[in-house]
């Protein structure tokens, strides 16, 4: 039985199957080779939620003094039923988040469809291609009492798992 991820608008996306991973890594290697030939640094943003999607767009929009792009960004999201849908949306040039700042959606569209400096993926093998890794995963702070930020705890499971994935996929 196949698993699906549903966007907030109800669009249905089939989760990747085992043979999709090698195809996806080949797609990324081709993109990265072209971007390196243009002299661009490869940046991987791990997590493309509210913070990560904006970070990926801002970095992908970076340019030198002559207006030339300097970075190629791979936004990486785990392929879960809860969040996989963000990947195909970004790859269409659509923002996976709602924000009051209209520039975010414009920047994502520009970087994906015009500048070609942003893509999204589900494969952790993408880490092997990165020059720089930015980790933007959810770390909730659970307050025990209002007005006292010193009493509470941070839920760091996603961050710890991210570090394990990074360690398994990059060389020192």
Give a label for each model feature.
Residues 1-172:
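Structural/interface elements that position substrates and couple domains in central-metabolism enzymes
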């Amino acid at each position: 039985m196949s698993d699906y991820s549903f966007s907030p608008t109800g669009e249905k996306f089939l989760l990747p199957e085992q043979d999709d991973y090698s195809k996806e890594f080949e797609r990324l290697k081709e993109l990265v080779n072209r971007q390196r030939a243009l002299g661009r640094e490869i940046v991987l943003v791990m997590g493309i939620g509210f913070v990560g999607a904006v970070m990926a767009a801002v970095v992908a929009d970076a340019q030198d003094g002559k207006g030339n792009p300097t970075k190629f960004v791979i936004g990486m999201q785990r392929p879960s039923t809860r969040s996989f849908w963000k990947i195909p949306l970004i790859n269409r040039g659509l923002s996976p988040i709602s924000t009051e700042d209209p520039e975010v959606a414009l920047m994502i569209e520009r970087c994906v469809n015009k500048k070609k400096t942003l893509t999204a993926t589900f494969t952790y093998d993408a880490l092997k291609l990165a020059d720089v890794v930015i980790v933007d995963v959810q770390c909730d702070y659970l307050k025990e009492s209002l007005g006292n930020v010193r009493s509470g705890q941070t839920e760091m499971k996603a961050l710890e798992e991210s570090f394990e994935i990074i360690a398994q996929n990059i060389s020192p």
